[in-house]
């Protein structure tokens, strides 16, 4: 019996270590509401990586039908959106989602979300870590504020 418990503890220890890995830090999350009702909203944020590389594999919200992650690529001088399954979060580095670059496309956003309100977003990482925070909802014509990477404290 004691031997079985000891073996079980040894087998479960790596899983517990993975589950307790620190999550990347997400900050400056905001959502640009669509100018036309029924169109997708855009989502933007800054992620700071931990000591180990990770990957953002999805974002969800109870206030949206679905959320896609997109990159912008230059194909023959024409900028095109491309849906992505994941984005690398470098160890001790940063991943930025900003207007004109990487961004979220938020489909079926709840119509009661108004400028000045918030939208809960859950960020899922390849490591199994999840980070939930409230993103500020901004009007389609609101000025863009750049994220401040220097403001992050390790």
Where are these regions (language model features)?
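Bacterial N-terminal signal peptides that target proteins for export
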Residues: 1-9
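N-terminal signal peptide c-region/cleavage motif recognized by signal peptidases
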Residues: 12-16
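Compact, glycine-rich, soluble single-domain proteins
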Residues: 21-154
């Amino acid at each position: 019996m004691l031997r079985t418990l000891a073996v079980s503890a040894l087998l479960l220890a790596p899983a517990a270590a993975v589950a307790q890995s620190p999550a990347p830090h997400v900050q400056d999350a905001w959502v640009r509401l669509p100018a036309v009702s029924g169109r997708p909203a855009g989502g933007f944020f800054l992620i700071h990586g931990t000591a180990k590389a990770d990957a953002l594999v999805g974002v969800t919200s109870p206030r949206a039908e679905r959320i896609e992650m997109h990159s912008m690529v230059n194909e023959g001088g024409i900028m095109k959106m491309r849906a992505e399954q994941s984005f690398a979060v470098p160890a001790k580095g940063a991943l930025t989602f900003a207007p004109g670059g990487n961004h979220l496309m938020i489909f079926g956003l709840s119509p009661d979300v108004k400028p000045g309100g918030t939208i809960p977003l859950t960020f899922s990482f390849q490591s199994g870590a999840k980070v939930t925070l409230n993103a500020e909802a901004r009007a389609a014509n609101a000025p863009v504020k750049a994220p401040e990477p220097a403001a992050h404290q390790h």
